[in-house]
Amino acid sequence: MERAGPGSARPQQQWDQDSVEAWLDDHWDFTFSYFVRKGTREMVNAWFAERVHTIPVCKEGIKGHTESCSCPLQPSPRAESSVPGTPTRKISASEFDRPLRPIVIKDSEGTVSFLSDSDKKEQMPLTSPRFDNDEGDQCSRLLELVKDISSHLDVTALCHKIFLHIHGLISADRYSLFLVCEDSSNDKFLISRLFDVAEGSTLEEASNNCIRLEWNKGIVGHVAAFGEPLNIKDAYEDPRFNAEVDQITGYKTQSILCMPIKNHREEVVGVAQAINKKSGNGGTFTEKDEKDFAAYLAFCGIVLHNAQLYETSLLENKRNQVLLDLASLIFEEQQSLEVILKKIAATIISFMQVQKCTIFIVDEDCSDSFSSVFHMECEELEKSSDTLTRERDANRINYMYAQYVKNTMEPLNIPDVSKDKRFPWTNENMGNINQQCIRSLLCTPIKNGKKNKVIGVCQLVNKMEETTGKVKAFNRNDEQFLEAFVIFCGLGIQNTQMYEAVERAMAKQMVTLEVLSYHASAAEEETRELQSLAAAVVPSAQTLKITDFSFSDFELSDLETALCTIRMFTDLNLVQNFQMKHEVLCKWILSVKKNYRKNVAYHNWRHAFNTAQCMFAALKAGKIQKRLTDLEILALLIAALSHDLDHRGVNNSYIQRSEHPLAQLYCHSIMEHHHFDQCLMILNSPGNQILSGLSIEEYKTTLKIIKQAILATDLALYIKRRGEFFELIMKNQFNLEDPHQKELFLAMLMTACDLSAITKPWPIQQRIAELVATEFFDQGDRERKELNIEPADLMNREKKNKIPSMQVGFIDAICLQLYEALTHVSEDCFPLLDGCRKNRQKWQALAEQQEKTLINGESSQTKRN
């Protein structure tokens, strides 16, 4: 370093710290010699301490990340050694040695079935009751009755016999048995199981007549509603008596003894009625008659309870058979979600007798909406189509109830939608509902195995009466059965989605193999050359001018761009903080460079390098580095270099329209997802693992930021999110301490760096614009040739004269407000805004000149004509 002598007229040179550091970076031999000669033990210890990377005891360092793109880290198997969800053993193997009937049997036609033929069971014949008046034989009659009850489950036959036993005690003229039932609206009523049982009457005669009585109406209805017996001497004097039955049958009712039949929970399950006492006490029933009647009716309660258990078990058997058939159906078809849901909907419609079945699939990426809707009506059951049509008239499907059920995670049963006050309808909406003929509705959430997440909703409309075809309300049984149905429906959906995920993974593998066939890791010779050159000297950032927003790479070789990248990692303290080996860093940089296609005019390695350089300048010269964490800086630089990996020179729209395999992998940001996958592939490749010094948590965090940053370069996402960022800036509410706002800022910063070519000095901007136009015109040519479509003006080679005006429009619509907002965050980023404004003036002048030329040309042509 030269100094001015005492007598020299030349002033002493003033150097700031950055200039000294840059000079030391450029003169590595002197720096090394000075450190060896002047370095103290404290300096050496501090040097080591600066490079020691502390890893938490509970976290395990990553030496080689070989995880797939979709799942970067897998938890240790020992971490989940005890799974809470593991079912406990509830039956031992020895219990299967008991002589139970076969699970699967064949019926008379040889068809395999889960149900046994209950009609073929051998039953002991019912014995006729003995009507001895000897009280000593009453005990034997009771024992005989108990024996019959224990061996038979026919409610009608047993109750008929009980009434014949009762007749021997109380001697009434007629007996009737009414059972409590519920309709589809859960309203109770009474139906006669035995009517007018008399001495000498047969079972067939007593059970043929079926009468329905309303709840809490008449003598029987009153006893059923209040659960208290009635002993009426003269029926016609009681206002509760209904004489319509007498008028129909021509029978004269005098005295009535009516008693409730209760189960073990003291619930009324039936009502027994004795009519017209034959002898004694003036034709009225005595207290002894009441006691005897009540005693025998206790047996009726037992019979009804046992029979209900038996009927319930038969019903459950039949339900289980349907569910087993549904399970078999689900596992037969797992390839197509449309096919499996068509079969499920057809099963539900036919079994539950409903008009319409709609299955809504929740969007995994946006839980507030549905990704797919599958609708089927009973008229479609006879159609032979193998798939459900997704595209339907939106007016045919109502989303409001499904959205409500998805949010509440509880079933919804509406007997009449027009009368339900939870969903206010306007007159216009009511007309729409009437047009759709919606009356009763049952809607149930479809949950995953953990019961804490809704993956879909099943909606049934209009329960139909089998006999009359009229619409009725869904009852509790329908709710329970649909809840069981949707469990299997959820299994089918999840299995099919897993199958589709496997298919997507296979498509991803095909794309990866295609990429790997084109690309390869950096050659060892090239890596050694860069490593040797970097070990000798890497010029300072000032010398390389990579902290300038006006930086241009046109004069640099590819090897020099790699050296600049090493300097960026070094000056951002990433090499030191994360213990990156120079050999690994060199190979990773060259591998990234190699994975950019050379036949792409603009979106190649040079564009990625310029994006990273702008990011470096924003962090350093723009003073943003001190406002971010080391992991965020690391992720941003990696994302900037990798954000267009394996770009094919075409946009997302072309990928979709050409039906490229990449379009099968992602529903949005197709190329950006692919760029991230390529980034992970390189990071996980042997010799390229620059993140191996991170802990597991740091690795996860870094990958998350990298993915968010790369996806942020999709202009469609930028346009969707920028309004929130601009509003925060405008209202002075922007706060980098808020995690969401910080994520939003990093996304905006990535876009600003990606578009930074628009801020370069005019000669550089013109050259880059020519490269962009070349790439766009190549895509337009391919659209004409391969897709037979007329390209947009931006891609149309024949509209080249519109480039200046399109550039002005692009700056106004996309760029200008972004750089204004970025300048509000950091005033040191003003050169980006200033460059953008100056280039807009240049493009505006060219556009006006182009327009004048066009007008003059048209005028000259008119004069000639």
Curated annotation (Swiss-Prot):
Pathway the protein takes part in: Purine metabolism; 3',5'-cyclic GMP degradation; GMP from 3',5'-cyclic GMP: step 1/1
UniProt KW ATP-binding keyword: no
PROSITE patterns, A to Z: PDEASE_I_1 (PS00126), PDEASE_I_2 (PS51845)
Binding site for Zn(2+): 607, 643-644, 754
EC numbers for this chain: 3.1.4.35
GO terms for biological process, alphabetical: cAMP-mediated signaling; cGMP catabolic process
Chain sites annotated for binding Mg(2+): 644
UniProt-annotated binding residues for 3',5'-cyclic GMP: 807
Phosphoserine PTM sites in chain numbering: 92
GAF domain span: 154-304, 336-493
Alphabetized UniProt keyword annotations: Allosteric enzyme, cGMP, cGMP-binding, Hydrolase, Magnesium, Metal-binding, Nucleotide-binding, Phosphoprotein, Repeat, Zinc
PDEase domain: residues covered: 526-850
Reported cofactor(s): Zn(2+); Mg(2+)
Free-text remark on how the cofactor is bound: Binds 1 Zn(2+) ion per subunit. Binds 2 divalent metal cations per subunit: site 1 preferentially binds zinc, while site 2 has a preference for magnesium. Tightly binds zinc.
GO MF annotations, alphabetized: 3',5'-cyclic-AMP phosphodiesterase activity; 3',5'-cyclic-GMP phosphodiesterase activity; cGMP binding; cyclic-nucleotide phosphodiesterase activity; metal ion binding
InterPro entries, A to Z: GAF, GAF-like_dom_sf, HD/PDEase_dom, PDEase, PDEase_catalytic_dom, PDEase_catalytic_dom_sf, PDEase_CS
Domain of life: Eukaryota
Name of protein: cGMP-specific 3',5'-cyclic phosphodiesterase
Natural source organism: Bos taurus (Bovine)
Classification of source organism: Eukaryota, Metazoa, Chordata, Craniata, Vertebrata
